[in-house]
Regions:
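Single-stranded nucleic acid-binding surfaces, predominantly the OB-fold ssDNA-binding core
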Residues: 1-96
């Protein structure tokens, strides 16, 4: 299974573009900051993650303000020929 849920804000956003198939696409950088329990101890977790939205989700996300908190749902995939670089593919998002 490859399903990811992440609370994050959009820190950076590229221009809305189109894939070779003609679908809208939006490249973004997400920032996450939380406190979680790990091995019985509280741990602060910060992460910055490359992400992409395709289709109607890309159009919706492009119209949202930078810095707003969202709950993102999607999957992780390698970035083209460089499979060691992970990109979060956003399939849906809602207000966190």
């Amino acid at each position: 299974m490859n399903r990811t849920l992440l609370s994050a804000s959009v820190a950076e956003q590229g221009a809305l573009r189109h894939t070779p198939a003609g679908l809208p696409a939006l490249d973004v950088w997400l920032e996450h900051d939380s406190q979680l329990e790990e091995a019985g101890q509280m741990r602060r977790v910060r992460a910055r993650l490359r992400a992409v939205a395709i289709g109607p989700v890309a159009e919706r996300l492009a119209s949202q303000p930078l810095g707003a908190q969202w709950r993102f749902e999607g999957f992780l995939a390698g970035s083209g020929a460089q499979a060691s670089r992970v990109v979060f593919h956003i399939q849906d998002f809602q207000q966190d």
